[in-house]
Amino acid sequence: MAQTLAAASLVLVPLVTAQQIGSIAENHPELKTYRCGSQAGCVAQSTSVVLDINAHWIHQMGAQTSCTTSSGLDPSLCPDKVTCSQNCVVEGITDYSSFGVQNSGDAITLRQYQVQNGQIKTLRPRVYLLAEDGINYSKLQLLNQEFTFDVDASKLPCGMNGALYLSEMDASGGRSALNPAGATYGTGYCDAQCFNPGPWINGEANTLGAGACCQEMDLWEANSRSTIFSPHPCTTAGLYACTGAECYSICDGYGCTYNPYELGAKDYYGYGLTVDTAKPITVVMQFVTADNTATGTLAEIRRLYVQEGMVIGNSAVAMTEAFCSSSRTFEALGGLQRMGEALGRGMVPVFSIWDDPSLWMHWLDSDGAGPCGSTEGDPAFIQANYPNTAVTFSKVRWGDIDSTYSV
């Protein structure tokens, strides 16, 4: 059963002079997750997901005119963020499957393509984990904890990225007088690339074209041929709206990257290899502190896999400050300690699938980062040859170290 939230469920949110919530109810797909403890075991949680605000229809109040155009905000409706909030209405999404999102119990499948009106449409869905209230994001505090999930990456060819990562978004999605919709409608996204998120930033009109910066922990960026994980610290806490040159100095957009192929383990990850991507994989991420407490300094990030009842250790060393010492930007922006501070404050799980029209995902799976050929990441090639491209995440759980998996 999906969680349905109409405007009535937000009666406590201020609506005066604010971007209105429309008449179409939001129908969040449930995604059962698990909170685990070394003594109590794992307890199921009635969580759900929401698509990013940019997937929602935002239109003029009392009319069918969109508040955005192909080039951004409609200036006649949104000359400034206050006027925009008064003129525009956000509608809920009732059928997530039409956006490439399918759920079943504790599993979620994200699809890159879908045939609509006889044409193949590229979808690239990105969803965020909501708390059990369905109104706020689920913010996980993971210092001296572990985060574990199962993933089927077998339908992700070269050039694709089925990602699961953490973003230091605000729990409410930036809910305010100008943004009553908040997390319920997928507002507030940010990451360490500080990209311009489009017409909306923290749920308000992005009239300045600002970038949305925040700390990011990439737990899993992968396809069937290559995988990485990467922390991305920032000098700021939470979402920061950057402009101009500062967007390139606030966060470490590249991060300290752990890629087994790039580190020399070329027969470690892939079809039929040690970590066999032809089969489902359990991925465990552990965030170990210097004093083994939830208030300590992040000292090490460990990765291990479980497949067919066997624990598979990481291909080389774990990620430590020494491992990341060659990344000058990472160290200058605070390194693991700064990343750990964000993990201590709490971060929101993000699930996505996407291709890379600009770089063809070479940074992930080609040019020394993986075994893929130079043209395999071309989105046109992927669409023509792999129309069923998809990723499935399931059994998402977190808790005490060594409490989320068994063999």
UniProtKB/Swiss-Prot annotation:
Its main location: secreted. The active site is at E216 (nucleophile), E221 (proton donor). Its EC number is 3.2.1.4. One of its GO terms (molecular function) is cellulase activity. It catalyses: Endohydrolysis of (1->4)-beta-D-glucosidic linkages in cellulose, lichenin and cereal beta-D-glucans. The keyword Thylakoid does not apply. Keywords: Carbohydrate metabolism, Cellulose degradation, Glycoprotein, Glycosidase, Hydrolase, Polysaccharide degradation, Secreted, Signal. Has endoglucanase activity on substrates containing beta-1,4 glycosidic bonds, like in carboxymethylcellulose (CMC), hydroxyethylcellulose (HEC) and beta-glucan. Involved in the degradation of complex natural cellulosic substrates. This is Probable endo-beta-1,4-glucanase celB. The gene is celB.
